[in-house]
Amino acid sequence: MIRLRLLAVTLGFFASGTVFAADLPRAKPEEVGMSSERLARIGEVLKADIAAGRIPGAVIAIARHGKLVALDAHGWRDKAAGVAMTTDTIFNIASMTKPMVTVGALMLYERGQLLIGDPLSKYFPKFSNMKVAARDANGEPTAETVPAVRQITIQDLMRHTSGIIYGGRGNTLVHKMYPAGSGDASREYDGAAFVDKLASLPLLYQPATVWDYGFGLDLLGLTIEKISGQALGQYLKASLFTPLGMNDTGFAISPDQAARYARPLPNDPDTGKPQARSPELTQPLKFECGGGCAASTASDYLRFAMMLMNQGRSGEARLLGPRTVAYMLSDQLGPNIKNLIGNADPTRADYGFGLGLAVRTTPGVVKMMGSIGQFSWPGASGTDWWADPKEELAVVYMSAAPGPLRWHYRQVINALVYQAIVD
């Protein structure tokens, strides 16, 4: 059944994201070990780049020691239409959907309804006897296949070790067989057809041997639907979004939310080529993809980040047990799985990977600052977030700025936030 992203307002669900600023305690930067003068550099850099036409606008939300330090909007929500950015602007968060879907699955795990070691074929039998592309003398995949040595598991979906890939992230024979990405696939296939398509394709790698980016979280979302008997968005709304007060987060965009939706610049600032103007608002989703089809606000997503940093608790509500969160945030790759995270996000090369997100395993080596245990995962449309439990720091940065520039701003925002910590 086709689900349109543009739906009628559901009574009581679509409250303004600015409510968050009222119910989270605020603090002056100096009260939580940060410098107002240094934090102001974020706005200075963003305003200069907005004026130079590099990005349309941005919203940044920062919390430290459980208190809101900054919730600021800069530039344009829709520059072409002359609409200014506001803190309740809604963004396509793309792969920032993945950690939320992982949390939704772990809730089923805590109820005994889903096991991390379950084979995917338990829920979708067509994945029972997968084939893997054979390699030629140069190590390149060929049209020949060999049997998978073991089943794909739920853990493989969560940590991107299933061998199932995104077609748009390579040029091999196998990549050309796969859909390009989550958004494209969700507009081309319904859930059943999507499962049939992926189950018919060879894996690029044997399961549990290589981290490579792909459709694992989309399949996890469909697994959640099968277990819960609900659409993914409906399940996450009841179990995650509503308990956290994430009232502007979901897969369905109301008319009110569409009016608050951030749009990219008409042309890519680097190449000058036209950019897609938010096709997710006009093209129907045939299934709610767990890999990248949600929208949210900076303040909503900050709630989610802080819940994980607070070991599964938000106020009086406990969404996950602390040991489940610790397991989610632990490195799931180890020494025997080849780590290609840097191919998906060069700024997170040398990170480890937990369940649904990257985890930092060293204070150095990586291109960005952060403590061991920092966790994150960005979105290809220009959004990013991270939480650093050691620093009690959570940051969400949102901009409608797809393309290679997003890697630049991930590093810029990281540097500008950490340099403002002075305690």
What annotation goes with each model-predicted range?
Residues 385-386, 392-401:
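Short, well-ordered beta-strand elements
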Residues 40-47, 60, 66, 71, ...:
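Active-site SXXK
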Residues 8-18:
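Bacterial N-terminal signal peptides
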Residues 22-93, 113-115, 129-137, 277, ...:
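Short, conserved catalytic-motif segment at the N-terminal edge
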Residues 25, 119-372:
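Short, surface-exposed loop or secondary-structure junction motifs
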